[in-house]
Design a protein with these regions (language model features):
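Domain-level signal for Mg2+-assisted phosphodiester chemistry and nucleotide/NA-binding surfaces
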Residues: 1-92, 112-117, 122-123, 129
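Non-catalytic, usually N-terminal nucleic-acid engagement modules in DNA/RNA processing proteins
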Residues: 102
Length: 131
């Protein structure tokens, strides 16, 4: 059956980075790249979707589960915490998932990656070069 891939996108972070660099976030090419390497069984994107409504169509076209994270205040991104919990929960509840892709514009996910690897999962981080 090949690799069973789970993708977790810190959308708020990556979209803001792309906008600062005058880039447009386009998910289809990433999904096609991953599909060539296995079955993309799960894709979740985390953010305040009232702020990123222009991306919804592309995300839904790629069967992404949109996880609403309300922006309460500036500071620590609540999406990071929720995304890490969901990824680890998926690793435990769905042991057939063997590859975890973390798409983010920051480096807050190091502890998650270490723990996923302890559980025998292959991890791939995708983000800006400077992260």
């Amino acid at each position: 059956m090949g690799n069973q891939i789970a993708v977790f996108i810190d959308f708020e972070n990556i979209a803001l980075w792309a906008e600062q660099e005058f880039l447009d976030f386009e998910l289809t090419s990433l999904v096609e790249y991953l599909q060539a390497r296995g079955n993309v069984a799960l894709i979740r994107a985390y953010g305040d979707w009232s702020r990123f409504s222009r991306y919804r169509e592309d995300l839904m076209h790629n069967t992404v589960d949109l996880i609403q994270i309300y922006s309460v205040r500036a500071g620590k991104n609540r999406a990071d915490i929720r995304m890490a919990i969901d990824a680890f929960e998926a690793a435990i509840q769905r042991p057939q998932l063997d590859t975890f892709v973390i798409v983010s514009g920051d480096s807050d996910f190091g502890p998650l990656v270490v723990k996923l690897r302890e559980y025998g999962k292959y991890t791939l981080g995708i983000g800006p070069r400077e992260v």
